Amino acid sequence: MTDPQQPYFDVIVVGAGNAALCAALAAREQGASVAVLEKAPASEQGGNCPYTGGGFRFVHNGIGDLRPLLPDLTDDEAGRIEMAPYTSDDFRNHLTTVTHGDTRTDLMDTLIAQSRPTIDWMTAQGVRWDIYSRLSAVVGAPSVIPNSVGLTAWESGPGLINMLTTSCRRAGISVLYETEMSGLTQDDSGVVVGVVARDSDETYRIRSKAVILACGGFEANAEMRGKHIGSGWELAKVRGSRHNTGDGHRAAMTIGAQPIGQWDGCHGTPIDIDAPATGDIQVTDQMPRRSYTLGISVNLEGKRFVDEGEGFAEQTFVSMGRAILRQENGIAIQIFDSKARPHLEGRYGGSQKFEADTISQLAEQIGVDAATLAATMDAYNEQAHDGEYHPRELDGRSTNDVKPPKSNWAIRIDKPPFSAFTVTGGITYTYGGLKIDTNSRVLDSGDSPIAGLYAAGEIVGGIFYHNSLRAAGLMHGAVFGKIAGEQAARI
């Protein structure tokens, strides 16, 4: 028997990011009373969403189809934009390719089919949009804008959280900040009937008909990173929220939820060694260091350890981050010569760089053995090629006889001054999570729904494997958040 003195809501949503707030709004729209439990203080609300650019990948028919969603876009701007349709087949092919075909087809099909309807629904909930790469739309005639990420939330990730939170307040949804979910409660038949909540004053129970877990991954939990992703990852700096510590994973699996997906996989990237230990909205986006394809990367012994030119950085930055974290202290040094410098990302301008006219002098500055670094450089240059860099082409110029090889952009590093940048690995979010069905119901080990329990967002496993697809994360969070809210409210 439940205690009538315990607070009650029809639906409890754990988390207050994109997926969680979409779930809360969808449940409220169905007439349910809703409480949102946010572990973070109000100033840090939103999980990883505030650290994103707010981009959404969805099916559309080109710029004409998007105009109703962009009331601030002038006719003149729209007339100078070329944007091809983004079809269901495009979306399916892209997601299948980056996940090596491992993504769950049932979730993928639901994501794709519901992507545009969910964008329209979010618009009705008060979300405003901006055209992706809008600035380029006013300088060219016409401007060709990528079709795959057609829209971003107004004022990016922080703006999205602000808009969704405002809509929740207007809808009468209670948001309980600095309130942590420490466990799920069940009745005698195993139905989830609430949560154990903890704030600064007390631990107490909140009753409900349904609970939606939308509280992110476990990327900010060093112990879980080391256990599941592997040795070295406990050293990773966290690029997003410090509050995403796997609370939902642990609570759900304690009552029999089935784990699924690539638990040893995550989205990560090389970042500046001076990046903060956890996300900082002001600087996080300036920390990635992804021009490694144009030079060599060495560890603290002065030795290369990875194929820097295996592919474009957009395809390899996750594996590069993983490789760096396997090195001593999770540190690497990117080295370039003056031929490469004009091609480095602008973000390198915010780094502490080391610069010298000789490799020996550079080695002394970065604290590695000069003889070892010189031998590494000589072995590389002996097999490398003369010429200039063409960063947007896989040029095939390789050093196949050097171990490890460099498959592209193997240009001799021989024109001083030489520059070095110290980097480490940063983690954005994790891939492993809970198994759900297409109604966002959490499944047990026998693939049966756990009554009263739903999940959405990063906590869901089975969507991303090996790599992620830009702007698909926010989209799948919104799609399955909306579904979870609707389904939970109908119990």
Feature names for model-found ranges:
Residues 45, 60, 100, 104-203, ...:
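Conserved redox-cofactor binding core of oxidoreductases
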Residues 5-19:
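Beta1/beta-strand and adjacent pyrophosphate-binding region of the FAD-binding site
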Residues 199-201, 205-275, 474, 480-483:
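Glycine-rich loop(s) and the adjacent beta-strand/alpha-helix scaffold that form part
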Residues 245, 249-372:
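An anion/pyrophosphate-binding glycine-rich loop and adjacent beta-alpha core
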Residues 77-141, 358-379:
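Rossmann-like flavin
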Residues 183, 372-467:
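A glycine-rich dinucleotide-binding beta-alpha-beta segment and adjacent secondary-structure elements
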Residues 29-50:
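Glycine-rich FAD pyrophosphate-binding loop
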